[in-house]
A protein has these predicted regions:
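Short helix-onset patch at the extreme N-terminus, typifying the N->h transition
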Residues: 7-9, 273
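N-terminal secretory signal peptides that target proteins for export/translocation
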Residues: 1-5
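Bacterial N-terminal signal peptides
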Residues: 10-22
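Predominantly soluble domains enriched in secretory-pathway, periplasmic, or organellar proteins
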Residues: 22-441
Length: 441
């Protein structure tokens, strides 16, 4: 077919105008971010592209990636999505089970692996680093992306622990190792403790916490770091308590004389939103499905319980795990890790709550009259839960069936509905954690 001169000009103008106005059938079908899953079965990281239209996940180029160590358990994205850090717990170290046969000695120790994130979500390994304690359990970064923290189960020198008794191993404390993050390369440099020295007069290379640390969180304002811990039960190290550090550009200082006791039976997770701090009590004496303990942060980081106190989780779930609050601060979602292994066992699910904008009080979604949370479907044994960078979708990565499960978030009601095309996506074996990185591509 041939066009006249005027026809060619008209066609060119139409194409130009359509392009300028963004009038194209696939204008919104782009990636809104990348989703990464750590898996312990093969020591891998699964990478996915998040589709804007449907929330579907498609593998990034060359995924999966080696985690840079053995037993990856946590990860985080820092510096506006430039860097991915993976915490490998290792094996065969103090207090750990023996390594499986065939694990190279170089991979047996715990480390933090640094990856750069490419334009299409691909990962490139850069370097690895070590925390200053034993058995790392979690990793966090401040909201500025300039400092990284690792929580270790035990210190290398127990004499630096407050309340340590040599005849009682339960009094060996944990620690937080702090690093500066280079904004250009992502490389880490250790921050020494300027407030505490060892018996030789040398500044510690870590910041001691209480005994039996379980998990920790940096509040969004970066002002405090809260660590939940089992504790030894002494006056200086109470059981089921929260250890508080004030954070000043990665330099940590005690802001409370002793850890803050809680009424919990079995603390398992902690999460901090812009306004509130939430603890999970997985104990079954009060409520078989666990409790949420909501707080505000007061003077010097002291936790003040919200009016109404603890909130029961859904009665049809078990093993309450990680949680997240949506970008509006309106809804809290809790991943229940019940394994879905038998028809009679409590099912894995997501509990949803509305957050009162004035009081912070949690109430179940959908106006349930029972006073317990409404539950939404999830894969088997979810280990993490997050909202995607476009604030449209909620995802969990599930240990028992090695999948990622997605749902659409109703921004008005908070209810979750299945993705329109596919709900479940296969990923690396035995997922342990998940993170997402936003993008404009």
């Amino acid at each position: 077919m041939k066009f006249s001169r005027f026809g060619r000009i008209g066609l060119a103008l139409a194409v130009s105008l359509g392009t300028g106005l963004g009038v194209t059938s696939c204008s919104t079908n782009h990636a809104v971010g990348y989703f990464y899953v750590t898996g312990s079965q093969y020591n891998q990281i699964g990478g996915f592209r998040i589709d804007n239209n449907l929330g579907n996940l498609t593998a990034t180029e060359n995924s999966p990636y080696a985690s840079g160590g053995y037993n990856p358990i946590k990860a985080l994205v820092a510096n506006a999505g430039k860097f991915l850090y993976v915490l490998n717990a290792g094996c065969g170290q103090t207090g750990q089970s023996a390594c499986p046969s065939g694990v190279p000695a170089a991979n047996a120790g715990a480390n933090i692996s640094l990856f750069t994130i490419g334009g299409k979500g691909g990962l490139s390994f850069q370097a690895s680093y070590n925390s200053q304690g034993n058995q790392p359990v979690s990793i966090q970064a401040d909201s500025s992306g300039t400092h990284l923290f690792v929580l270790d189960s035990t210190v290398t020198d127990p004499t630096t622990c407050v309340g340590y008794v040599s005849s009682n191993p339960d009094t060996i404390c944990g620690d937080i190792t702090a690093f500066n993050i280079d904004p250009n390369t992502g490389r880490l440099s250790l921050i020494t403790n300027q407030g505490v020295k060892n018996g030789n007069g040398t500044n510690l290379s870590y910041f001691p916490v209480g005994s039996g640390p379980i998990n920790f969180v940096v509040v969004p304002s970066n002002s405090f770091i809260y660590t939940i811990e089992k504790g030894s039960g002494s006056a200086l190290d109470p059981s089921q308590a929260v250890f508080v550090y004030a954070n000043n550009s990665g330099q940590l200082a005690l802001s409370q004389n002793t850890p803050i006791p809680t009424p919990a039976e079995d603390l398992t997770y902690i999460y901090a939103s812009a306004k509130y701090v939430y603890l999970i009590d997985a104990g079954q004496n009060v409520n078989a499905s666990g409790l949420i303990l909501p707080y505000t942060a007061g003077t010097n980081g002291a936790l003040q319980s919200l009016v109404g106190g603890q909130v029961p989780n859904s009665g049809t779930t078990s093993d309450p795990g990680p949680m997240t609050v949506d970008h509006q601060g309106k809804f809290l979602y809790l991943a229940n890790q019940g394994p879905n292994l038998t028809p009679t066992s409590p099912s894995s699910s997501v509990s949803g709550f509305f957050i009162d904008p004035t009081t912070g009080r949690l109430t179940p979604l959908s106006g349930a009259s029972s006073g317990t949370a409404v539950s939404f479907g999830a894969g088997s044994a979810p280990q993490c839960i997050l909202e995607d960078p476009s604030n449209q979708y909620l995802y969990t990565a599930n240990f028992a069936d090695s999948t990622v499960t997605g749902a659409v978030i109703n921004s008005t009601t908070g209810t979750l509905t299945t993705l329109r095309k596919s709900t479940s996506f296969a990923t690396v074996g035995q997922p342990t954690w998940c993170v997402a990185s936003g993008t404009l591509f």
